[in-house]
């Protein structure tokens, strides 16, 4: 499955992009929203990943943690498929507890915009996140060499319900492999949100080519 990343100023604009999109799931980046009337998203809830990314891991703006937690709580009243929260954030535990109460899936994420650590460190990160028992673990460092992709893709040998790939131009190949190995992967609906991100259409075409072989 492919999750299209929705970057919009409000829910109505997000809905318009979802209606035009051809993804299986849609990650709605509430950290980009300028207003928070979320009701228009309700009809699409079972296909939504709600993300309120903190600035330190690629968020569009700096939002106080208490405000982020309240936004997560409001968003979870929609009953989305998943919420995505960073493992290193102060509110991760509380978001996960609230999600379990509401029977909303949790993606626990880790992003590194500087590089890719050694495989042993990646395994420590994976094991630490898995110990928190999320529904999906997401690990996304940045590739500074082609070998960084190999380090990250090796994680699939040690975990299920894992989404792992590299950002950056050198990480594009790992994004393609993640579409084959992960429960879902991410692609842009329009302009790339993260370095090296493919569009939904581009990723679908590559997957068709691989399937044809």
Curated annotation (Swiss-Prot):
* InterPro entries in alphabetical order: Aldolase_TIM, DHquinase_I, Type-I_3-dehydroquinase
Q: What is its EC number?
A: 4.2.1.10
Q: Which UniProt keywords apply?
A: Amino-acid biosynthesis, Aromatic amino acid biosynthesis, Lyase, Schiff base
Record field: catalytic activity: 3-dehydroquinate = 3-dehydroshikimate + H2O
User: Short name of one Pfam family for this protein?
Assistant: DHquinase_I
Annotated 3-dehydroquinate binding sites: 27-29, 53, 175, 197
The pathway to which it is assigned is: Metabolic intermediate biosynthesis; chorismate biosynthesis; chorismate from D-erythrose 4-phosphate and phosphoenolpyruvate: step 3/7
Which biological process terms from the Gene Ontology are attached to this UniProt entry?
A: 3,4-dihydroxybenzoate biosynthetic process; amino acid biosynthetic process; aromatic amino acid family biosynthetic process; chorismate biosynthetic process
Q: Which residues form the active site?
A: 111, 138
Q: A GO molecular-function term, please?
A: 3-dehydroquinate dehydratase activity
The Swiss-Prot or TrEMBL record describes its family as follows:
Belongs to the type-I 3-dehydroquinase family.
Q: What does this protein do?
A: Involved in the third step of the chorismate pathway, which leads to the biosynthesis of aromatic amino acids. Catalyzes the cis-dehydration of 3-dehydroquinate (DHQ) and introduces the first double bond of the aromatic ring to yield 3-dehydroshikimate.
Subunit structure and binding partners: Homodimer.
Q: Which HAMAP family match?
A: AroD (MF_00214)
PANTHER family given for it? 3-DEHYDROQUINATE DEHYDRATASE
The name this protein carries in UniProt is 3-dehydroquinate dehydratase
From which source organism is this entry?
Thermococcus gammatolerans (strain DSM 15229 / JCM 11827 / EJ3)
Q: What does the organism's lineage look like at the top?
A: Archaea, Methanobacteriati, Methanobacteriota, Thermococci, Thermococcales
Q: Which gene encodes it?
A: aroD
């Amino acid at each position: 499955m492919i999750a299209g990343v929705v970057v919009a100023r409000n829910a109505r604009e997000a809905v318009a992009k979802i209606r035009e999109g051809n993804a299986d799931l849609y990650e709605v980046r509430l950290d980009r929203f300028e207003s928070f009337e979320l009701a228009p998203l309700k009809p699409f809830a079972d296909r939504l990943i709600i993300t309120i990314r903190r600035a330190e891991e690629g968020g569009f703006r700096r939002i106080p943690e208490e405000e982020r937690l309240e936004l997560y709580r409001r968003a979870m009243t929609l009953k989305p498929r998943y919420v995505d929260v960073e493992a290193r954030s102060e509110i991760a535990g509380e978001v996960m507890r609230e999600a379990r109460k509401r029977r909303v899936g949790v993606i626990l994420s880790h992003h590194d915009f500087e590089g890719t650590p050694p495989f042993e460190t990646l395994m420590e990160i994976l094991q630490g996140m898995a110990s928190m028992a999320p529904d999906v673990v997401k690990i996304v460092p940045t590739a500074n060499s082609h070998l960084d992709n190999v380090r990250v893709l090796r994680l699939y040998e040690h975990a299920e319900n894992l989404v792992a790939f590299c950002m950056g131009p050198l990480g594009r190949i790992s994004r393609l492999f993640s579409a084959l190995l992960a429960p879902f992967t991410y692609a842009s609906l329009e302009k790339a949100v993260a370095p090296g991100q493919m569009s939904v259409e581009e990723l679908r075409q590559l997957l068709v080519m691989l399937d044809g072989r």
